[in-house]
């Protein structure tokens, strides 16, 4: 039995869960999220209101989807109650970010500013010209947008310049030695 998959997902008060076959809908104070659960996995409610994820057999595919489905459901519940935030920072001379309406405009050493538009359900916040955050209720969407932004100017291994996640340690390389 999957150690993660066998644990029930607790549903806090104020969160409404609707199970319709393989489709799961979670509605909370921050919004609504839906998930299509993969075929061999079944989802049901326990007496105490928690969500229970079960698998029909011990095939490799069922075992791998068991823990995944449970974690995705737990992420939905956390998303509609607390939400997700990814803090990011920019290092480099002249590198900065500013909020333009709901979008982010970056100056990252290119000959032009780079504009990142906020997709539906994602909000940006700028704390300083070098620190900003990406927030939303969908963990996958927050992570994807954060990765797209980081890819604009990856951290340089020699000088450490670029966009990185807050607290991320960049592995530095030693430059060429002069004679």
UniProtKB/Swiss-Prot annotation:
Signal peptide: none annotated. GO terms for cellular component: cytosolic large ribosomal subunit. The keyword DNA repair does not apply. Disulfide bonds: none annotated. Keywords: Ribonucleoprotein, Ribosomal protein, RNA-binding, rRNA-binding. Part of the 50S ribosomal subunit. Belongs to the universal ribosomal protein uL6 family. This is Large ribosomal subunit protein uL6.
């Amino acid at each position: 039995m999957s150690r993660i998959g066998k644990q029930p997902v607790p549903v806090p008060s104020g969160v409404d869960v609707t199970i319709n076959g393989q489709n799961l809908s979670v509605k909370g104070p921050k919004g609504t999220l839906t998930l299509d659960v993969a075929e061999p996995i079944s989802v049901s409610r326990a007496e105490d209101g928690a969500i229970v994820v079960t698998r029909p057999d011990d095939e490799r595919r069922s075992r791998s989807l068991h823990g995944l489905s449970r974690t995705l459901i737990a992420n939905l519940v956390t998303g509609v109650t607390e939400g997700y935030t990814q803090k990011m920072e920019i290092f480099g001379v002249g590198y900065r970010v500013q909020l333009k309406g709901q979008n982010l405009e970056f100056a990252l050493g290119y000959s032009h500013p780079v504009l990142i538009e906020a997709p539906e359900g994602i909000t940006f916040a700028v704390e300083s010209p070098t620190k900003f955050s990406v927030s939303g209720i969908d963990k996958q969407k927050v992570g994807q947008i954060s990765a797209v932004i980081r890819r604009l100017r990856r951290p340089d291994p020699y000088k450490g310049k670029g966009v990185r996640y807050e607290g991320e340690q960049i592995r530095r390389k030693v430059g060429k030695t002069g004679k």
